[in-house]
């Protein structure tokens, strides 16, 4: 929860009523029942036997696979029962308030957990977890609220602490050299996009979902394009306008606080980097129709989006606590943008390991500023966001998450 006023907050229910560990229920003297040992073993079984062991509140260890990569400490009895009922939601809540702790590397723990769940994807238990997760809608009003929840947490006092310092890119960087700095890799990503689009001086560009506006400014400054960029986050648009004015680009970059559905005018290039995850799969044809409406006959475009290996919703905790309304599509689902509108798909690239590397940089910077972030928000917020960043990195490493860049033209 944010300690100040005026920005979005992260709502993490106090799983035990207080949001802190109940020392009595977590006491090492609290007995472990035979049923609870069985439940812990069953949880590992239903999770696909990940290389994890469970340590219960009395210190008793329930072994999982041989040579576990990490140990999950469950600090009280109620936490175990909550975890059994809905692990995809309650693990994140319990970890955030300290009632579950991980011994070992958090990313490695989550990666082996994802691989385990992936192997158990078709079991009744996994299917039930997905049924329990009800996604938010993506109407224009809902989209604005969903974006506010995640992005309007404070530009300078939060995101600037751990994103790249030049362009505030909250999307996958590009690492042609693994030893690159985050700033160099984000600049390389923007050049990679511009080269794919064959961007040249005088091109008119429509950008759907511009974040803090770094790509639009890069296109204008280094490629001579004129860019109109749309975004429904008030804080991001205000920041982007200020940066454009300070860099002398206000005459070549226009930031519009409006929904992508309302893009108007005629353009040579249509680009969207990191917005499709928020569109919702029922609206892919709408996005394609917008691109079709505004592109010239020789127009070309690029969509850059987090995706999935199989069609399913986000983990319930991410959907309800971190990224409401988000849905990463499969490659097949993304074709709904292009095929109904007669677009030709020229190139598809998967940059998932580049995103894992990007998240490694973000997580390191986030941890470097964790005490400062805790002073702004609180300890539960820090633990929740550490889990979110580590879990995202693990998802890309395990291959459950993808990063697709698709280039298209009219024909």
Regions found by a protein language model. Name each.
Residues 212-223:
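Conserved SAM-binding loop of SAM-dependent methyltransferases across substrates and taxa
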Residues 2-180, 184-186, 192:
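Feature captures hydrophobic
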Residues 285-298:
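A short glycine-rich, Lys/Arg-flanked "PGG" loop and its adjoining helix->strand segment in the class I
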Residues 240-241:
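Conserved SAM-binding loop
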Residues 298-306:
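Conserved beta-strand signature within the Rossmann-like core of class I S-adenosyl-L-methionine
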């Amino acid at each position: 929860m944010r300690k100040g006023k005026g920005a979005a907050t992260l709502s993490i229910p106090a799983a035990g009523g207080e949001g802190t560990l109940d020392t009595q229920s977590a006491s090492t003297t609290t007995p472990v029942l035979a049923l609870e040992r069985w439940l812990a073993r069953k949880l590992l079984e239903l999770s696909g036997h990940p290389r994890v062991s469970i340590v219960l509140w009395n210190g008793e260890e329930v072994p999982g696979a041989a040579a576990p990569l990490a140990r999950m400490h469950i600090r009280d009895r109620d936490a175990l029962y909550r975890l059994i009922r809905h692990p995809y939601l309650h693990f994140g809540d319990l970890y955030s308030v300290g009632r579950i702790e991980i011994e070992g590397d958090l990313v490695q723990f989550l990666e082996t957990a994802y691989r385990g769940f992936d192997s158990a994807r078709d079991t009744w238990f996994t299917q039930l977890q997905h049924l329990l997760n009800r996604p938010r809608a993506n109407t224009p009003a809902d989209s604005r609220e969903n974006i506010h929840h995640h992005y309007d947490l404070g530009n300078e006092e939060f995101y600037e602490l751990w994103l790249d310092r030049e362009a505030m890119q909250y999307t996958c960087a590009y690492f042609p050299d693994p030893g690159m700095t985050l700033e160099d890799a984000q600049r390389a990503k923007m050049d990679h996009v511009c080269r794919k689009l064959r961007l040249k001086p005088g091109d008119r560009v429509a950008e759907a979902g511009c974040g803090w506006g770094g790509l639009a400014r890069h296109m204008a400054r280094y490629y001579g394009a004129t860019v109109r960029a749309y975004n429904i986050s008030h804080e991001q648009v205000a920041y982007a306008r200020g940066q454009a004015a300070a860099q002398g680009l206000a005459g070549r970059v226009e930031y519009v606080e409006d929904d992508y559905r309302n893009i108007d005018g005629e353009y040579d290039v249509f680009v969207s980097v990191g917005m499709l995850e928020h569109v919702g799969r029922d609206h892919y044809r709408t996005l394609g129709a917008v691109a079709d409406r505004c592109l010239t006959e020789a127009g070309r475009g690029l969509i850059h989006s987090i995706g999935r290996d199989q069609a399913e919703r986000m983990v319930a905790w991410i959907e309800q606590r971190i990224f409401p309304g988000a849905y990463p599509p499969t490659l097949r689902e993304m074709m709904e943008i292009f095929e109904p509108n007669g677009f030709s798909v020229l190139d598809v690239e998967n940059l998932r390991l580049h995103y894992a590397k990007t998240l490694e940089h973000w997580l390191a910077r986030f941890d470097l500023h964790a005490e400062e972030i805790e002073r702004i928000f609180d300890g539960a917020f820090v633990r929740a966001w550490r889990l979110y960043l580590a879990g995202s990195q693990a998802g890309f490493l395990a291959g459950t998450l993808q990063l697709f860049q698709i280039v298209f033209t009219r024909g």
